[in-house]
Swiss-Prot record:
Part of the 50S ribosomal subunit. Forms a bridge to the 30S subunit in the 70S ribosome. One of the primary rRNA binding proteins. Required for association of the 30S and 50S subunits to form the 70S ribosome, for tRNA binding and peptide bond formation. It has been suggested to have peptidyltransferase activity; this is somewhat controversial. Makes several contacts with the 16S rRNA in the 70S ribosome. It comes from the Bacteria. The lineage of its organism: Bacteria, Bacillati, Actinomycetota, Actinomycetes, Micromonosporales. This is Large ribosomal subunit protein uL2. Residues 40-58, 269-279 have a biased composition (Basic residues).
Length: 279
């Protein structure tokens, strides 16, 4: 993937850039692997906003991705196309299996049209192949890693990310996450070889608010810029600091929201960025 920069012909074009989509080989998706994706606008079943800054955007259809691949062990597949997926940052690859079935997978780096991929304990160590962690050499970069055997890939599914297999001891493998966290995972869990492609996606400059609206992202308005009826930080004469510790529109303290004491915390060897100096 490369990034194409625009000339500053308008204020919205100034500094903006776009992916060149050179790796895309087909523009129309496989119809049998599509599912409807109705818009929620960030609302729940009662019509209340539960996730802010969502709404609008271009109409999409969901591409059904195979995150397990366990039922295709030993069945080789040919990469028919590399396609664009509006629902994720990574590209997806359409596989044609030898038994005639078609499936989508997340496309790793260096996977090309015409390549052969396979899954199972005996698969080769090359991009796109899927194996249990116990069969992958130490030091290999992997993606689409399961947290529980048979549960489907949960880790490293975004563009440009990869996990390093640091070692194995007993029933667990030690992994280094993209965040720097080191955690243990059952060696029966499966993973795909290589890092995910489209790494330059994070370097795209969207240029104008309208492009974010096309993506279904609405503006983020500060609470101190609102009226008192809209936010606890709103109101006041002139510019104010809000007058209290940061809270959300419902008055609950803002900040870290992750629940402590999760059962899987015992498998974390080192928290993310534990060695980074603060200052």
């Amino acid at each position: 993937m490369a990034i194409r920069k625009y000339r500053p012909t308008t204020p919205g074009r100034r500094g903006s850039s776009v992916a060149d989509f050179a790796e895309i080989t087909r523009s129309t998706p496989e119809k049998s692997l599509l599912a409807p994706l109705p818009k929620k606008g960030g609302r729940n079943a009662h019509g209340r906003i539960t996730t802010r800054h969502q709404g609008g955007g271009h109409k999409r259809q969901y591409r059904i991705i195979d995150f397990k691949r366990v039922d295709k062990d030993g069945v080789p597949a040919k990469v028919a196309h590399i396609e664009y997926d509006p629902n994720r940052t990574a590209r997806i690859a359409l596989l044609h299996f030898l038994d005639g079935e078609k499936r989508y997978i997340v496309a790793p780096k260096d996977l090309k049209q015409g390549d052969i991929v396979e899954s199972g304990p005996g698969a080769d160590i090359k991009p796109g192949n899927n194996l249990p962690l116990r069969n992958i050499p130490v030091g290999t970069t992997i993606h689409n890693v399961e947290l529980r055997p048979g549960g489907g890939a949960k880790l490293a599914r975004s563009a440009g990310v990869g996990i390093q297999l640091l070692g194995r001891e007993g029933a667990y493998a030690t992994l280094r996450m993209p965040s720097g966290e080191i955690r243990r995972v059952d060696v029966r869990c499966r993973a795909s070889i290589g890092e995910i492609g489209n790494a330059d996606q994070s370097n795209i400059n969207w240029g104008k608010a309208g492009r974010m609206r096309w993506k279904g992202k609405r503006p983020t308005v500060r609470g101190v810029a609102m009226n008192p009826v809209d936010h606890p930080h709103g109101g006041g004469e002139g510019k104010t600091s809000g007058g209290r510790h940061p809270v959300n529109p419902q008055g609950k303290p803002e900040g870290r929201t992750r629940r402590k004491g999760q059962p899987s915390d015992r498998l974390i060897v080192r928290r993310r960025y534990a060695t980074r100096k603060r200052g």
